[in-house]
């Protein structure tokens, strides 16, 4: 399992330090430029494909740690880097006070069950599975993806139903953290029949 490799903001760290963990994504479709040796985006994609191929030759499956629960843009005072600059009212949960609702602990929470947002997440998963050949995904704070309007937990979140029904993802492994920073904890009761969950107590 690889730590997040989506393109992320390396300056998202306190006191002038550098963020190298990758849990502040900017783009869900692009490998982080500092992890690869080429300046060309296409050559970087080819390089990552080659990495996956070599792992498979050695009988090693590749699981990506993916962060779809928030972006690097922080709260409403943060910079407009990706989805905030396109349509913040679509991509994020925003309260009546205009502040971002946050169960990620990072200042914002992606509204994963809205139609266009779901489609973007599904297309990202398909890209990494079909184009790059990865074998599975581990959802960071995965239960946050089950939240609907007003952050209400959904019994049957459309995002997980879409994943289960997507032909290109039928053989892909899914693993999730069954908790978020808003207190939702669904170990043994995760709302997706094809997702394994981490046991935080263990």
What does each of the following model-derived ranges do?
Residues 3-133, 141-168, 184:
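Substrate-binding/active-site clefts of carbohydrate-active enzymes
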Residues 155, 160-164, 171-202:
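Polar, glycine-rich mid-to-C-terminal structural blocks
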């Amino acid at each position: 399992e690889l730590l997040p490799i989506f393109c992320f903001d390396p300056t998202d760290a306190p006191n002038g330090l550098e963020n190298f963990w990758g849990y502040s994504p900017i783009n869900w479709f692009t490998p982080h430029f500092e992890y690869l040796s080429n300046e060309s985006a296409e050559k970087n994609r080819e390089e990552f494909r080659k990495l996956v191929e070599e792992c498979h030759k050695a009988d090693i499956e590749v699981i990506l740690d993916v962060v779809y629960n928030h972006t690097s843009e922080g709260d409403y005072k943060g910079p407009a880097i990706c989805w905030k600059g396109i349509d913040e009212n679509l991509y994020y949960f925003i309260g009546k006070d205009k502040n971002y609702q946050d169960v990620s602990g990072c200042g914002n929470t992606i509204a994963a069950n809205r139609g266009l947002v779901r489609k973007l997440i599904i297309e990202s998963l398909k890209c990494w599975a079909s184009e790059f050949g990865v074998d599975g995904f581990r959802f960071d704070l995965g239960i946050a993806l089950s939240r609907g309007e007003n952050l209400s937990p959904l019994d049957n979140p459309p995002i997980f139903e879409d994943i289960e029904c997507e032909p290109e993802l039928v053989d892909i492994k899914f693993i999730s953290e069954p908790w978020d920073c808003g207190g939702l904890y669904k170990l043994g009761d995760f709302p997706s029949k094809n997702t394994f969950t981490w046991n935080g107590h263990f």
